[in-house]
UniProtKB/Swiss-Prot annotation:
Protein name (Swiss-Prot/TrEMBL): RNA 3'-terminal phosphate cyclase
Keyword Nucleotide-binding carried by entry: yes
Active-site feature positions: H322
UniProt binding sites for ATP: Q103, H297, L298, A299, D300, Q301
Source species, domain of life: Bacteria
């Protein structure tokens, strides 16, 4: 029997990413694991509905034996079986993130015995998770360059706290994975500001987009790209239908020569449209102020596929606790090593086998 890998869920940032990465890697490598202190660093530790759905989705896809799969559990033992392609459907039962559930199981399905389709119901635009737009516009184009055939479709928007959204991904087995090198993002080609509204007054989106646009003509003069590109940003205000609200999301997509990045914030009761726009502007400005190719959140999403490819590198302005914790977990399962080298403008992250 394979050696059981013992993991401490309280290590590093102590969040759900430790569990999600462990589930993905356990399915792929066939190595069982047991974890204690699940989400110990969060206000509500243990398995929430989103995490429990990820565990049960992984269990179904590989026929795993599992202990501790219940709400609030802070301990889990997971013994995987063979990965099986096919049609899968999972419901979170809350506004928990569909995207995080998908990101848990999709890497395993890159190594399945056939094509797969996975549909998840829950939240699609969540504050503490990649949005469906991020997955479709940012992450999947990079995966395609690595040799991964995966396409996610947003079926219905779902916002916190109601949820009610859905997304589905069709994925094909990968014959081989190629490394990816993202050292420079190149010139900015196009920027698009988009406000999504569901059962929220239209003027909220108009104010968000106007505030976002107004930020950049007065931006610091040493950030060359800002004045050159943001006044020309495309501006869209989209009113959604179909009872998927209330909810509001504002995003700024920055398409560069080497990759696309997307920065988003979400409207909540008691927060003005201008404050939402200021949050997006702050994140986008911080990204453009650095020559690093990859934003902080995308860096987290690249660790697992690069590790599976066994090679690759990227630059990022900040090595977050989330990033470093994910690296530690990956290195427990795979015979790869990451280096995170400080540079004048941030960090150079490399992986090799």
């Amino acid at each position: 029997m394979a050696r059981i890998i013992a993991l401490d869920g309280a290590q590093g940032e102590g969040g759900g990413q430790i569990l999600r990465s462990a589930l993905s890697l356990s399915m792929i490598t066939g190595q069982p694991f047991e974890m204690s202190g699940i989400r110990a660093g969060r206000a509500k530790p243990g398995l929430l509905r989103q995490h429990l759905t990820a565990v049960r989705a992984a269990t179904e896809i590989c026929g795993a034996q599992v202990n501790g799969d219940e709400l609030g559990s802070q301990q889990l033992r997971f013994t995987p079986g063979p990965i099986r392609g096919g049609e899968y459907r999972f419901a979170i039962g809350s506004a928990g993130s569909c995207m995080l559930v998908l990101q848990t199981v999709l890497p395993a399905l890159w190594f399945a015995d056939g094509s797969s389709r996975v549909e998840v119901h829950g939240g699609t635009h969540n504050q503490a998770a990649p949005s469906a737009d991020f997955i479709c516009r940012v992450w999947e184009p990079l995966l395609a360059r690595m040799g991964i055939s995966q396409r996610t479709t947003l079926i219905k928007h779902g916002f916190y706290p109601a949820g009610g959204g859905a997304a589905a991904t069709v994925v094909e087995p990968a014959t081989s994975l190629r490394g990816l090198t993202l050292i420079s993002r190149g010139e900015t080609l196009r920027t698009t500001a988009e406000a999504l509204l569901a059962a929220v007054p239209y003027h909220v989106g108009e104010r968000e987009v106007a505030t976002l646009e107004a930020h950049f003509p007065q931006a610091e003069k040493n950030v060359v790209a800002l004045e050159a590109h943001f006044p020309q940003a495309e501006k869209n205000v989209v009113a959604l239908e179909g009872g998927c609200g209330p909810g509001n999301a504002l995003s700024l997509m920055i398409q560069s020569e080497q990759l696309t990045e997307l920065f988003a914030a979400f409207g909540v009761k008691g927060t003005s449209a201008e404050a939402v726009a200021n949050q997006v502007a702050h994140e986008a400005r911080r990204y453009l102020a650095s020559p690093a190719a990859v934003g902080e959140h995308l860096a987290d999403q690249l660790i697992l596929p690069l590790a599976l490819a066994g090679e690759g590198a990227f630059t990022v302005a900040r090595a977050s606790a989330h990033l470093l914790t994910n690296i530690v977990v990956v290195e427990r399962f795979l015979p790869v090593r990451f280096s995170c080298e400080a540079t004048e403008s941030g960090y150079l992250v490399r992986v090799s086998d």
